[in-house]
């Protein structure tokens, strides 16, 4: 899953270990699956993984949390034979619910009531990375931008920022554990309310060697943030800024909130402040319903002209309940050809 999911998976493992669990892959008593729902393929993979976990571990407690789990119904829970379904802002409760299930409690669904209105921070913590050589540090959750193709706001909820002091303290513990590299992550990192201050505080930690962003929306890359990054010796010269399309008409239909020229100006400004060696990578969606052949060519021309270091290209996937899903869809062969 995404970097936010990876952080949450490690933090859940740490919480279970704190209650006496031992991480392992053979004959587990507890299987925790941190799910994703960004595309229809992600949904299918989650269901497949849950079924496999149950088939291979018939007596284990199977817990599903994360974005796909946020929308699981009781009928789906029964069909997939999941013991615990946990919503996106309640993952800190997993050790408690696992203990209840192991003690003979009933299967359950614990999902946030109105996640798009609740201002709740899921209080997971991590002292050191367990599965990676670099540490992901989640400092933000949720999104309220409602791009027309995106299901994330309905499953991740209202934007919320982790308290600055708490985030810095976790970064200190991680670096003092022997991990010198931190990747700041969130569902929409640019909505963190004190991001420049956070960069300066973490960058000043005595044992930090490398600081990165997972991904940041272009509008959040402003002069205040760029100055903080330029003043941070630990910051690695890389920004991943999702573009999605290089065509203004498609960007408008996507409700991205910027034009291609705006993105180009932000990229140029970032290179002007951080240096021409700045590596800018991006995401490019192909096959959006309003993307005709001319729009696709304009998007390609824009990408070629901007000089990205890396482009992650992926096909549009309709998500039920989003405005784009109600639009007339392109033929699948057209999408795959692009």
Predicted regions and their residues:
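C-terminal accessory region of radical SAM enzymes
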Residues: 264-266, 272-281, 310, 320, ...
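Radical SAM enzyme [4Fe-4S]-AdoMet core and its adjacent flexible, acidic
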Residues: 2, 192-208, 254, 318-338
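Residue-level preference for long, well-ordered alpha-helices that form the structural scaffold
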Residues: 42, 163, 259, 292, ...
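Proteins enriched for Cys/Gly/acidic motifs involved in redox and nucleic-acid/cofactor modification
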Residues: 1-185, 191, 224, 239, ...
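Hydrophobic alpha-helical scaffolding
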Residues: 36, 157-160, 214-216, 256, ...
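Contiguous mid-protein beta-loop-alpha structural module that forms a pocket-lining wall or clamp
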Residues: 291, 306-308
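Conserved SAM/AdoMet-binding glycine-rich loop
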Residues: 62-66, 71-72, 175-292
